[in-house]
């Protein structure tokens, strides 16, 4: 449904060339939800704005439903954009118009008959759960309600694609979850392909089928959510996955943690990351028996993404130095990521 082919975007900033996107290619099948994740300034917003040509690529092609938008005339592009809805971090509602009037605006601009507008807007407000707010002005809505109005307005032209530019970034966690649930419902019931950009891996984990990781204008990793979460290949992807966990050590351990062992009886605090089959295997107990080491678990958590289970454990590991080294090697050979956080006495 969406295919980006060798997209590059160069900006001229104070006489200098800035490569915002560098030879980016991305293919999103019809009906999928794809998340593009990256840090601030990575090129996420530029990428999504290239899909509907709000930003015209310096080079490359943008296909939506088989149509190369970069080859269209201005009039043809305007017509094709009706198939592409878009919502933003900031809701961009007209403060002088009611909820009903904001949703009806694109239909009014198309000179649709009032009866059809009423039918369409009523159905959309029901879909986003705002039937009782139709006569309310934006100033009297919560952030989540404003985003629901924006979603309804974006759906007014029956788009095939919905672009979401940091659509939940300004919302609290509970409201974020409700908006993500709504987007998932829209995807399932209407069959709309969704491309969203975010800096939060939790968003990807909750609703996406695919994920692409962008860094400094380049897509450095992409695949299904289950593939990326079970076997992240880049350090940045690993960092984003790690951010979904509440992985804080107890204060009493943080206070005495050192980078190197201070005494011969110091022992390491180690973080173990499990994905795929390694999550269900009793690897720590096997390792304990095999190498005569003990694991005192301090923090542990398991989660799911794309049907794949993954998790981590932070433990203090006791045993002689050689046994601990062999235990670490054994676990790494069993597809467990091992990271020594420090040492305690």
Curated annotation (Swiss-Prot):
Its EC number is 7.4.2.11. It is an enzyme of class 7 (translocase). Residues 2-241 form the ABC transporter domain. ATP binds at residues 38-45. The keyword Ribonucleoprotein does not apply. This is Methionine import ATP-binding protein MetN. PROSITE patterns: ABC_TRANSPORTER_1, ABC_TRANSPORTER_2, METN. GO terms for cellular component: Gram-negative-bacterium-type cell wall; plasma membrane. Its main location: membrane. InterPro entries: AAA+_ATPase, ABC_MetN_proteobac, ABC_transporter-like_ATP-bd, ABC_transporter-like_CS, ACT-like_dom_sf, MetN_ABC, MetN_ABC_transporter-like, NIL_domain. The complex is composed of two ATP-binding proteins (MetN), two transmembrane proteins (MetI) and a solute-binding protein (MetQ). Keywords: Amino-acid transport, ATP-binding, Cell inner membrane, Cell membrane, Membrane, Nucleotide-binding, Translocase, Transport. It is found in: Cell inner membrane. It catalyses: L-methionine(out) + ATP + H2O = L-methionine(in) + ADP + phosphate + H(+); D-methionine(out) + ATP + H2O = D-methionine(in) + ADP + phosphate + H(+). It is a peripheral membrane protein. Belongs to the ABC transporter superfamily. Methionine importer (TC 3.A.1.24) family. GO terms for molecular function: ABC-type D-methionine transporter activity; ATP binding; ATP hydrolysis activity. Part of the ABC transporter complex MetNIQ involved in methionine import. Responsible for energy coupling to the transport system. It comes from Mannheimia succiniciproducens (strain KCTC 0769BP / MBEL55E). The keyword Cell membrane applies.
């Amino acid at each position: 449904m969406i295919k980006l082919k060798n997209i590059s975007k160069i900006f001229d900033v104070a006489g200098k060339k800035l490569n915002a996107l560098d030879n980016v290619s991305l293919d999103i099948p019809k009906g999928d939800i794809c998340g593009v994740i990256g840090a601030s300034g990575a090129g996420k917003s530029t990428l999504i704005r290239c899909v509907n040509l709000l930003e015209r690529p310096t080079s490359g092609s943008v296909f939506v439903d088989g149509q190369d938008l970069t080859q269209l005339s201005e009039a043809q592009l305007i017509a094709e954009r009706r198939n592409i809805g878009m919502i933003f971090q900031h809701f961009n509602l007209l403060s002088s118009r009611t909820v009903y009037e904001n949703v009806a605006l694109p239909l009014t601009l198309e000179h649709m008959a009032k009866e059809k507008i009423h039918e369409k807007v009523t159905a959309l407000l029901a879909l986003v759960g705002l039937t009782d707010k139709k006569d309310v002005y934006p100033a009297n809505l919560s952030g989540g309600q404003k985003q629901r109005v924006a979603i309804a307005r974006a759906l007014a032209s029956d788009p095939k694609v919905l672009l979401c530019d940091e659509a939940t970034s300004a919302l609290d966690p509970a409201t974020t979850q409700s908006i993500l649930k709504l987007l998932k419902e829209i995807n399932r019931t209407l069959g709309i392909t969704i491309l969203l950009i975010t800096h939060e891996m939790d968003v990807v984990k909750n609703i996406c089928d695919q994920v692409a990781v962008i860094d400094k204008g380049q897509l450095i990793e992409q695949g299904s959510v289950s593939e990326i979460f079970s076997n992240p290949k880049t350090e940045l992807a690993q960092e984003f996955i790690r951010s979904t966990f509440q992985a804080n050590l107890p204060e009493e351990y943080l206070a005495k943690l050192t980078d190197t062992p201070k005494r011969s009886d110091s022992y390491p605090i180690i973080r173990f990351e499990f994905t795929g089959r390694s999550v269900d295997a009793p690897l720590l107990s096997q390792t304990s028996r095999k190498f005569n080491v003990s694991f005192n678990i301090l923090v542990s958590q398991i989660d799911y993404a794309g049907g794949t289970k993954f998790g981590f454990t932070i433990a203090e590991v006791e045993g002689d130095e050689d046994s601990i080294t062999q235990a670490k090697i054994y676990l790494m050979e069993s597809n467990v990521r091992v990271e020594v956080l420090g040492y305690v006495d």
